[in-house]
C-alpha cells in the first residue's frame, strides 16, 4: 500500500472526540440471592450435610468481639474439612454476652477476658453500682410481714 491511501484511511477512522457515538458499558447488578445460589451450588459440589439442632453459633475474635448467629443453618463436609454457617449474624462485644458465653470460652479466651476486665475502667463500674440510697428505696416497696401465717395453717389442719 502506498502512504497516500493509508493516510486517507486513517483520516476516515474516528476513535473518539466530538460527534462519535458513545459505547455504553453494560453494568451487571448482582443480588444477594444470586450470590446465595452460587454459594449453595458450590456447597453442593462439596457434598455437605445439614446439621440440625444447633441453636446458636458464636465466633470469638481476638479483639474481644463475637460474631453471633441465632438459629443458624449449619452445613458440614467432613471430607473437605469445611463448615458453612448461614443466617443473620450480629457483631457483639464479649462483655454483652458474658453470663451465657463463659462455658464456650477456651483457655486463651479466658486470659484475654481477664486482660479486658483489668483494662475496664473503674469509673464505669462505680457508676453502674447501685447506691445505698437506691437500695433503701427498693426496700420500701416490699410490705412488712404482720402475722404468722404458718400457725393459721396448722390450726386449720387440726
Curated annotation (Swiss-Prot):
NAC-A/B domain span: 33-98
Biased composition (Acidic residues): 134-143
SMART domains in the record: NAC
Segments for region (Disordered): 123-158
Pfam families on file: NAC
PANTHER family tied to this protein: TRANSCRIPTION FACTOR BTF3 FAMILY MEMBER
Protein name: Transcription factor BTF3 homolog 4
Organism, as annotated: Xenopus laevis (African clawed frog)
Organism ancestry: Eukaryota, Metazoa, Chordata, Craniata, Vertebrata
Gene field: btf3l4
Amino acid at each position: 500500500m502506498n502512504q497516500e491511501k493509508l493516510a486517507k484511511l486513517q483520516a476516515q477512522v474516528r476513535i473518539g472526540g466530538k460527534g462519535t457515538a458513545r459505547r455504553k458499558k453494560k453494568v451487571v447488578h448482582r443480588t444477594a440471592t444470586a450470590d446465595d445460589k452460587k454459594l449453595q451450588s458450590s456447597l453442593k459440589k462439596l457434598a455437605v450435610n445439614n446439621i440440625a439442632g444447633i441453636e446458636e453459633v458464636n465466633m470469638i475474635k481476638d479483639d474481644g468481639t463475637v460474631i453471633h448467629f441465632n438459629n443458624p443453618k449449619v452445613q458440614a463436609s467432613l471430607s473437605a474439612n469445611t463448615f458453612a454457617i448461614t443466617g443473620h449474624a450480629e457483631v457483639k462485644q464479649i462483655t454483652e454476652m458474658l453470663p451465657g458465653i463463659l462455658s464456650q470460652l477456651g483457655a486463651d479466651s479466658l486470659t484475654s477476658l481477664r486482660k479486658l476486665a483489668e483494662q475496664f475502667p473503674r469509673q464505669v463500674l462505680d457508676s453502674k453500682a447501685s447506691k445505698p440510697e437506691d437500695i433503701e428505696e427498693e426496700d420500701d416497696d416490699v410490705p412488712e410481714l404482720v402475722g404468722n401465717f404458718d400457725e393459721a395453717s396448722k390450726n386449720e389442719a387440726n
